[in-house]
Amino acid sequence: MNESLPESPAKRFSRLFRKAGVFLAKEQFDQALMVFREGEALAVALDDKEKLALFREEIIQCEKHLRE
């Protein structure tokens, strides 16, 4: 298996959502927020408006939990 092949954007987005989900399950909203912001930056860089909207919605939800 060639380790030098870059990960596809779909796999990168999926990995970020799974990683954030682990933090959300543990109620570690600050860590989840950091991961969602990483996903937001990736979506901006790739000009993926659909994923950008998803990450931004999750960011809003995390920020609400942090304010509670």
Indicate residue ranges for each PLM-predicted region:
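Alpha-helical linker/edge segments of TPR/alpha-solenoid repeat scaffolds
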Residues: 58-68
